[in-house]
């Protein structure tokens, strides 16, 4: 039914299972939750699959805003729509995204930014439109996460935070494009604009870091250094284009010195993909004088201030931050999905585990122990 129809039928409250975080760092609990109808300009989605991102893990370990339903990398099918929604209808396949695109604010109409002023990253655990929740347990509110909350069989998102996708695209694969893989590719392509023959160093070889490597490889980078403390990442990283692996725990001298020696004076581009402000400084020290660019993608759990000597900038280096790799979700994700469907980019290789939704705590353990890239959780059919 079209939202413009005079016979618009208001959806009702439904109940479903959701993995709820009650206490920081403790196992999620499968609970029956009430999911309110979508309000104006919102849609309710039947989640088909969702993947665990390190941001979920970090927030779960430190988050005081509880109870909460985490999850923000997700794909599903529109179950119902709120008033005023014209872009979607019941049955559409969609990706949910943590940063939206209203299409009319200063940033959305600019070609320079994807930082929507209306539907930017939501940090209060509420919906953008009315600062309320759509989840409850026995009448008591349950907080959202990044305005997505995909660790639930059903969720409600603003229509500006959803992207309609080709129904032929496999949802259990492309769900990774709603955060990590897209963020890494975009950092290499949109933010750094890595050039053919350049040298790149990546700090942190999780899904985001390896996506940066894939993007750099596809751009023709000649040297891609990967820095991590997990030796198991060395062989895995080659698949995505890393030419040299550096275990920072094995070094007897400062990392920047090693990288400058390996690159002949410093990398053209460095990427901080851990979420550690100290590593951001190290990344800045590791890139070349004159033109070296450091791009930060990680979200720090603590100490958000970056400390760097002013001389690093006087020498011509630059530091840039990015959220979601600079992609405007509605405008750009469909073409990224096309690249996957045409086998121009890799997604499957990031999926190390496929688990049922009730195995969600196993996914958290695997990520906490560094034994996975992406665990895709499949909802009951």
Curated annotation (Swiss-Prot):
Zn(2+) 1 binds at residues 53, 55, 72, 179. Keywords: Cytoplasm, Metal-binding, NAD, Oxidoreductase, Zinc. Gene3D superfamilies: Medium-chain alcohol dehydrogenases, catalytic domain, NAD(P)-binding Rossmann-like Domain. It catalyses: a primary alcohol + NAD(+) = an aldehyde + NADH + H(+); a secondary alcohol + NAD(+) = a ketone + NADH + H(+). Binds 2 Zn(2+) ions per subunit. Its main location: cytoplasm. Zn(2+) 2 binds at residues 102, 105, 108, 116. It comes from the Eukaryota. Its EC number is 1.1.1.1. The keyword Zinc applies. One of its GO terms (molecular function) is alcohol dehydrogenase (NAD+) activity. An alcohol binds at residues 55, 72. NAD(+) binds at residues 55, 204-209, 228, 233, 297-299, 324, 374. It is found in: Cytoplasm. Its cofactor is Zn(2+). Pfam families: ADH_N, ADH_zinc_N. Belongs to the zinc-containing alcohol dehydrogenase family. Class-III subfamily. Homodimer. This is Alcohol dehydrogenase-like 6. It comes from Arabidopsis thaliana.
